[in-house]
Amino acid sequence: MKLEHPDRLMNRTPLSLAALETHDAFAERHIGPDAASQQAMLDTLGFASRAALIDAVIPASIRRAETLPLGPFAQPKSEAEALAALRALADKNQVFRSYIGQGYHDTHTPAVILRNVLENPAWYTAYTPYQPEISQGRLEALLNFQQMVADLTGLAISNASLLDEATAAAEAMTLLQRTGKPKSNVFYVADDVLPQTLEVIRTRALPIGIEVKTGPAADAAQANAFGVLLQYPGVNGDVRDYRALTDAIHAAGGHVVVAADLLALTVLTPPGEWGADVAIGNTQRFGVPMGFGGPHAAYLAVRDEFKRQMPGRLVGVTVDAQGKPALRLALQTREQHIRREKATSNVCTAQALLAIMASMYAVYHGPHGLKTIALRVNRIAALLAAGVKQLGFATVNDTFFDTLTIDTGARTAQVHEFAKAKRINLRRVSDTQVGVSVDETTTRDDLADLLDVFAQAAGGTAPAVDALDAGLAGVAALPAGLERTSAYLTHHVFNRHHSETEMLRYLRSLSDKDLALDRSMIPLGSCTMKLNATSEMLPVTWPEFGGIHPFAPAEQTVGYREMIDQLEQMLVAATGYAAVSLQPNAGSQGEYAGLLIIHAYHASRGEGHRDVCLIPASAHGTNPASAHMAGMKVVVVACDAQGNVDIADLKAKAEQHSANLAAIMITYPSTHGVFEQNVREICEIVHAHGGQVYVDGANMNAMVGLTAPGQFGGDVSHLNLHKTFCIPHGGGGPGVGPVAVGAHLAKFLPNQRSTGYARAEDGIGAVSAAPYGSASILPISWMYIAMMGAKNLTAATETAILNANYIAKRLAPHYPVLYSGPGGLVAHECILDLRPIKESSGISVDDVAKRLMDYGFHAPTMSFPVPGTLMVEPTESESQEELDRFIAAMIAIREEIRAVEEGRADREDNPLRHAPHTAAVVTANEWPHAYSREQAAYPVASLGTNKYWPPVGRADNAYGDRNLFCSCVPMSDYA
């Protein structure tokens, strides 16, 4: 029901309970414009109702006839009800003490980081820092991450995170394939690499013709491989000296990738010092909860010669217009949105928020604190080794950092039974061996419990921890010559913020530099920067979700899996497909998985030769990049003057490639913000030639409840839960990219055979390290759908379309709207054409984007899908007041441009060419411009009470790429 004023309710008799219940209250807080505002906007558009507008926008041939079939979630829950229902599911999980290891460890998240980063909307609602001037805070935090990784690995340069350790390993493999031994297609994986990593590597290698060989690390030099992956320490805990082996691999013409534990590298010689070419790994144990598998920030570091081949984001140092240091994303020409099928990777969203947490963990503890944690972990492992030996058990590995593999023989089942009684999980290595990985949360009481488990199995008495500690003067746990001697984290940022006061102020100083959703609307087209409600975010930090290991026994994860099953069914209802997998931990990975599923389907029918993928010229860069990674040949389909798929060209290309046609990849609504009228015909043409239809779900926010790709001809789609379903963007991740498929493709959904969470045997290989990907943020989308219900999800979609059309209508007299459908209407976003302005005034789309910062706004999406344009997506969460504020800013900027066109302002010395204007520039003694300081900083009256100041002037991108520097800069540079 609609909330009404209490005075009006008091005049009713009798007051029923139903009249006072507010199940729809959350929807009214999520959807920005109230009823009066919506009607005012509809009046502007010339429609009597929202329903009439939607009838005019969406083709009748694809309209959904029924209400979203959400079953028990059809009716909205209040925030309290939804939290209680989710709490009931969380309580079904059992949080055991986890010593499983295998790349995931329990950790303490410092409270100051938990509250002021993970739970702070200034950090989690920000977008990827493509506009560097308003992203300096998170860019600095990510630069700290890069410095941390480079220091600890001993390599020259690190990227700003990848999706997980297994994905990073696969990316390292393809990096070396591009740069390594030209006559070899072999990638050699040592047999003590994490099993989930090997599984993802196999998935990624198969479609691009890489042969994966496994075996003892010692045999790697004889494998004739272009690359070798070593684990340091190994999955069984061994710490091996790989110096001679690395030299031998190099002598044979190969390169070496090392999967390294960053905490171990505080005490072990780093890979870069013994010849590694690439290091990869996971930063999860630096303060990020296990979360049933994610999200966590992986890392990839390389020798200097490989820096231009690195996948993922890279933060670099440059200068601004005033010559002061500024940070920006560097070497963007490597990325999929520019190079398309020639990109180094299809990764877009990575794990920025988690990388920031990990970097702040290092800032908080500093080098001394990290080493103390590492030495304590190693000491506990040594005491455990000594204790189990006293009890008659042998350790398989004599060298170790934190992990022991213990030979338990016929008593293995007893060991697990006694451990279970103490709510302890050990790794099930085999029927005769168990693994124990300790971590920073392991206390002396925990150690005593572990010893007691083995004592019970041995029929003896556990040795006392204090006695073991007193009797163990030293232990040869690390190989001779592998103890680290080099310094790390020497930069001042890791050595000055160790009191909570200093740490708190540092975090605040960084967040104050950035413009996120907590300050203003972010109207990025194709990005769906909607509300990330607090009640949706709360469960992320519940220990019942955060404290679960991804490979915990199934009986301990009942609540998690029930929640996941429910969310999958919610997404099935929204998409019209038959089945969903939540394993892909980014949209790019869901897209990749979808293409592999299509290939598996064709292969199952004896048509594995089908490898041609049709992609419209207007498609997002991830589409061709993913198709290339999936082993497909990209054939571009032309678009007509209105931006729609050229049907004649599609028919010709489909006919030409009929025998080998695998798929078409389309986005709907299209990337130009319109519901194409002939989408059913497009699907039918491709199906007639034996192909499958991949519908990119990036624009699903315009479809939920109104139409569904699974109902108008799609066979497979990926979704972006960090767009449509309210997971925040986190400044560049985390994301979740579920893949949804029709019934005929369901059995091919991603598997993970190396764990106890396998799906259908015909499933493609794993695309993420954990069976459910970034599981700990799935409650966000569950909460959103549960609190909205079927009717309000549809209303949200309708309002997103209303808001976009309102902006288009209001701005059309000032900026041409490039594409529209019948009646001049758009879908959930609109493209403003600035190319005529460039011709008439010399003002570029970049100038307008930077000038918007002076008005307190993040720019819309620049030059996509058409160069020289801005794509605006307001989402349903923005109020009419905020839309009007943005419209006023855009109109004011158009008047500033008009002054240039008419000669009233200089073509170079004008507010747009010199934007953004910092406080330092505006208050300087010298003011060299013809326009006033007031026009520079306060061009509209509303800024007088709510002014955001960009911390740096316009970043010099060309300088940054010419003088690539991707490490922390000295304090003197900020003076």
From Swiss-Prot:
Modified sites of kind N6-(pyridoxal phosphate)lysine: 723
Sorted UniProt keywords: Oxidoreductase, Pyridoxal phosphate
Uppermost EC category: oxidoreductase
EC code: 1.4.4.2
Pfam families found in the cross-reference section: GcvP2_C (PF21478), GDC-P (PF02347)
One of the GO BP terms on file: glycine decarboxylation via glycine cleavage system
Keyword Oxidoreductase among record annotations: yes
Gene3D superfamilies linked: Aspartate Aminotransferase, domain 1, Type I PLP-dependent aspartate aminotransferase-like (Major domain)
Cofactor(s) the protein requires to work: pyridoxal 5'-phosphate
Superkingdom in the source lineage: Bacteria
Catalytic activity: N(6)-[(R)-lipoyl]-L-lysyl-[glycine-cleavage complex H protein] + glycine + H(+) = N(6)-[(R)-S(8)-aminomethyldihydrolipoyl]-L-lysyl-[glycine-cleavage complex H protein] + CO2
Cellular component terms per the entry's GO annotation: cytosol; glycine cleavage complex
One MF annotation (Gene Ontology) recorded for this entry: glycine binding
Quaternary context: The glycine cleavage system is composed of four proteins: P, T, L and H.
Function: The glycine cleavage system catalyzes the degradation of glycine. The P protein binds the alpha-amino group of glycine through its pyridoxal phosphate cofactor; CO(2) is released and the remaining methylamine moiety is then transferred to the lipoamide cofactor of the H protein.
Family under the similarity heading: Belongs to the GcvP family.
Protein name: Glycine dehydrogenase (decarboxylating)
Native species: Burkholderia orbicola (strain MC0-3)
Gene symbol of the encoding locus: gcvP
